[in-house]
Amino acid sequence: MSSISHQAAPTRAQHTNSYVQLARQLVTSVDNDPWGDVPPSVYETARVTSWAPWLEGHERRLAWLLERQSAAGSWGEGPTPYRLLPTLSVTEALLSTLRQNTAAGVSRERLAAAVDNGLAALRDLSGTGGWPDTAAIEILAPDLVVLINDHLDQPEVAALPRLGPWARGQRLAQPHGFQAALPDRVAERCQVAGGVPLKLHHTFEGVARRLPRMVPGVPGGLLGSSPAATAAWLATGPDEGRDQAVTALTAVAERYDGLFPEATPISVFERLWISVALARPGLPAACVPTIRAWAAEIYDATGVRGAPGLLPDTDDTAMAVLASALAGSPRDPSPLSAFEAGDHYDCYVGEDTGSSTANAHALQALTAWLSHRPATGDALQARRDLTRDWLLAQQESDGAWRDKWHASPYYATERCVTALSGHTGPTTRDAIRSAADWVLDAQSDDGSWGVWGGTAEETAYAVNILLNSPDHTGTPEATQALKLAENVLREAVHSSGHHHPALWHDKTLYAPQAMAQAEVIAALELLQARRP
């Protein structure tokens, strides 16, 4: 066995010219952007607007938020349950602006009208239920309801014609299933412990006003890689580190035209996921040096963090190990051992709910490492087999997998099928066949797939599932499905300015554009490579 530093990267002798060009352009673009290609967040921008109205660009942010209110009065993307938190966030921010009179250049009448419509939307939304498993929604939503109701108690709000009826009427009820007291209980636990745990930093805005001066300044200036958490810290925190935090917030605003994403930078996540996606059809030779450099920079023997200020996690650690192996420079998967939880991996230490996709990535990482270093012992092979069996047990009765990091089951199912496809045995093959059957049954007439409507990103995942199922290779049904899907992917790749909708979970939905585009480019190349 040759040294691991001399393993060849998985390149293919022949790629289509368009794939080589598109992959090279994408890798170059990502390499030149230290922040990450993700649209700004309505939720996050509204939180910064509320907590830091003094920050340059305040009226720009207000105008942008007003423009994004739907005809129904709500804000946000996706189905109704996903719109609760963005609507709470913007409604509170606009009420705060009205109370503090911080936007002389924005019509108070327009602000009040938007609040009126937002409150009406919230009255209808609150009883919906079925809330998504997004980051700390059980803390963030109740806190915002309390803040909104406090605003409605104030005389300066009651004096506004559009809002007087709300001020004199009933207050917003807590959304179905949420507890008004939970933010207080979380804050009390932090006070007893003498500090705020790292896992709460990213969503610190939900407890900040209950924990003044409880979090010291953080290296890099952004608390938990979150502009909202940082703005909340600036409003409630100590004097030390304030200049650094303001500088960091200002830099994010400059990158995103005065607005804010929910996590920044996302370069670790973006570069790892893009590397693995582009490796499926084989890395173009021109991309290998850059991807190798990314993997070397990101890999950390103590575990990889998705962004500065976040906890190390299985997902990013596994993807760093996997990307290293796929780029021909395998690195030891031992950092994953910190996340072992019996027969699977916790996504991070102290996790409340498990993740099938993080475990799928861990399985891929272990499999890739063992393919390079099969003599590394029985322990890793046993851990790999445990993870495989746990993953098989998570498959649902319809053949799909579902996960908390993504709204679409096509993502989770593709990750699990891809991880399992390198393993033999009737149980594994049956699971993959069941997943592919589910995919075939769900294709739309236009050739796309999607949980809420067809998207190119989800179509790429569905294509990978079908291509990984040996029982569907060459069947008329799969062949026709892939032919239709190829048209969908080609249109997304070659149409100018294609926008991938928000499907990923953070505090609300978000859309990592470059990552989704890599999936689409790679899936299209796999389909085109099948033709003689």
From Swiss-Prot:
Assigned EC number: 5.5.1.12
GO terms for biological process? diterpenoid biosynthetic process
Motif QXXDGSW motif mapped to chain: 443-449
Q: Which domain of life is it from?
A: Bacteria
Q: Which InterPro entries match?
A: SQ_cyclase_C (IPR032696), Terpene_synthase-like (IPR050148), Terpenoid_cyclase/PrenylTrfase (IPR008930)
Instruction: Name the top EC class.
Output: isomerase
Entry-linked SUPFAM superfamilies: Terpenoid cyclases/Protein prenyltransferases
Give cofactor(s), names only: Mg(2+)
Q: Which UniProt keywords apply?
A: Isomerase, Magnesium, Metal-binding
Q: Which reaction does it catalyse?
A: (2E,6E,10E)-geranylgeranyl diphosphate = (+)-copalyl diphosphate
Give the residue ranges of motif DXDDTA motif.
313-318
Q: Which Gene Ontology molecular function entries are recorded, alphabetically?
A: copalyl diphosphate synthase activity; magnesium ion binding; terpene synthase activity
Quote any Pfam family the record assigns: SQHop_cyclase_C
Name the job this protein performs: Involved in the biosynthesis of the mercapturic acid derivative diterpene cyslabdan A, a potentiator of the beta-lactam antibiotic imipenem. Catalyzes the conversion of geranylgeranyl diphosphate (GGDP) into (+)-copalyl diphosphate.
Query: Domain comment, in the record's words?
Result: The Asp-Xaa-Asp-Asp-Thr-Ala (DXDDTA) and Gln-Xaa-Xaa-Asp-Gly-Ser-Trp (QXXDGSW) motifs are expected to bind to Mg(2+).
- Give the family, as the similarity comment puts it: Belongs to the terpene synthase family.
Q: Could you identify this protein by its name?
A: Copalyl diphosphate synthase
